Design a protein with these regions (language model features):
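Structured beta-strand/loop patches that form or line metal/cofactor-binding pockets in enzymes
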Residues: 1-44, 50-57, 325-330
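Shared catalytic-loop signature of beta/alpha-barrel
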Residues: 224-239, 247-343
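Glycine-rich, aromatic-flanked loop segments that form ligand/cofactor-binding clefts
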Residues: 100-140
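Conserved, mostly hydrophobic/aromatic
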Residues: 3, 35, 42, 105, ...
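C-terminal extensions of enzymes
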Residues: 329-370
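Hydrophobic faces of well-ordered beta-strands that scaffold small-molecule active sites
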Residues: 45-47, 131-139, 160-164, 192-196, ...
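Metal- or metallocofactor-binding catalytic centers and their adjacent structured scaffolds
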Residues: 3-5, 38-116
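Metal-dependent enolase-superfamily TIM-barrel catalytic cores that perform enediolate-based chemistry
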Residues: 123-236
């Protein structure tokens, strides 16, 4: 089997509600990049990556040039014989770095391979181990009372885990109120965690954390470095989830050794695709670290790719996944599963098990042929 065509689209995804994070970062309308690989066996595979502006070392307009550079690897020969991980190893040797741009390529190769095998993608990533995956609901950093209202509404719909965005207004008192009011608004046992997305100083995160240390809450990535996050965890005694600083095996091991990684966000575009994410998943299972398996942003393709990896993970390792597609429009694969209460399940068809609609993608940004 050979890859004979690569097609790339850029699609604007608009959030249903503007998504405010710390340090002035906002998700409103963001370009997602969609990739399709066509093979000479008549099958195809889909991938997607959606970098948030000013968030991580990634940007939407960097994806297509990287794929052009990688064309000699993509069209080199028998991709199925080499395997997805073999092709991605060749891609890493040919073009070091640029993980976010390689992520949709890796995703599409896995989709194509699973379609060729006639199996759902989770069957190739570890088998179906967790059918119903718990979701979290992320709440934009807005007025504390409104955040509490949203939390109550979502938990009434079945959500059992709530992420509270912090730091958008640089107001410690408001962040303390956000955590207190959301915690009070949701049922006992609901997992509540406050996320600064690296935007807090060690001092501010410690002050906020100590003010809510009597509550059943967790903190997420308060500061820009793992050393600072570890210091905040030590000073507050609150469990911590690492996100932005987790991007490869060495960073996971460092966070574990520092004692600040009670949970971790494994995001496809940070690691470079499902191949690397699967290796990170296996390490976290060995360490006993709870995982949120997701990506930075995106629509149905990204959502389903990470849901398949989550479904192929033992239940004791899963903290949650994210139905990114529910936060944005358009839905580019209308047949993709949606949340049912506080859970989501993977499709059972071959590959990703979804059918992105060309009519929703617009004109291609890039077309390459072998």
């Amino acid at each position: 089997m050979n890859i004979i065509r690569l097609t790339v689209w850029q699609v604007p995804l608009t959030s249903h509600i503007a998504y405010n994070m710390s340090d002035g970062k906002i998700c409103d309308t963001v370009a997602t990049t969609v990739l399709r690989l066509d093979a000479d066996n008549g099958l195809f595979g889909w991938g997607e990556v959606c970098p948030i502006p000013h968030y991580l070392p990634a940007y939407a307009d960097g994806v297509a040039p990287a794929l052009i550079e990688l064309a000699p690897v993509i069209f080199a020969g028998d991709g199925l014989g080499l395997g997805v991980e073999g092709m991605m190893y060749a891609a890493d040797r040919y073009l070091p770095g640029h993980r976010y741009a390689k992520s949709p390529l890796d995703m599409a190769l896995w989709d194509l391979t699973a379609r060729t095998a006639g199996l759902p993608l989770y069957a190739l990533l570890g088998g179906l181990q967790t059918r119903q995956l718990p979701l979290y609901h992320s709440i934009s950093c807005i007025d504390p009372d409104e955040m509490a209202r949203i939390a109550a509404t979502e938990t009434a719909r079945g959500i059992t885990q709530v992420q509270v965005k912090l730091g958008a207004d640089r107001d410690n008192a408001a962040d303390i109120a956000r955590l207190q009011l959301v915690r009070a608004a949701v049922p006992e046992g609901t997992l509540v965690y406050g996320d600064w997305n690296c935007g807090a100083s060690r001092l501010d995160a410690t002050r906020v954390g100590r003010a809510v240390a009597d509550l059943d809450v967790m903190l997420e990535q308060p500061c820009a470095t793992l050393d600072e996050c570890a210091a905040v965890r030590d000073a507050t005694g609150l469990a911590m989830k690492i996100d932005e600083n987790a991007h490869d095996i060495p960073s996971l091991l460092q966070a574990w050794q520092l004692g600040c990684m009670d949970a971790v966000a494994l995001k496809s575009s940070k690691f470079g695709g499902l191949s690397a994410l699967r290796r990170a998943r296996d390490l976290c299972l060995s360490l006993g670290v709870k995982m949120c398996i997701e990506d930075t942003w995106g629509s149905d393709i990204t959502t389903m790719a990470t849901v398949h990896l989550g479904a192929a993970t033992p239940q004791q390792g899963i903290m949650n996944v994210c139905d990114l597609a529910s936060y944005v429009a358009p839905r580019i694969a209308p047949d993709a599963p949606s949340r049912q209460g506080g859970f989501i399940a993977p499709p059972t068809g071959p590959g990703l098990g979804i059918t992105p609609q060309d009519s929703l993608l617009g004109d291609p940004l890039l077309e390459l042929t072998a």
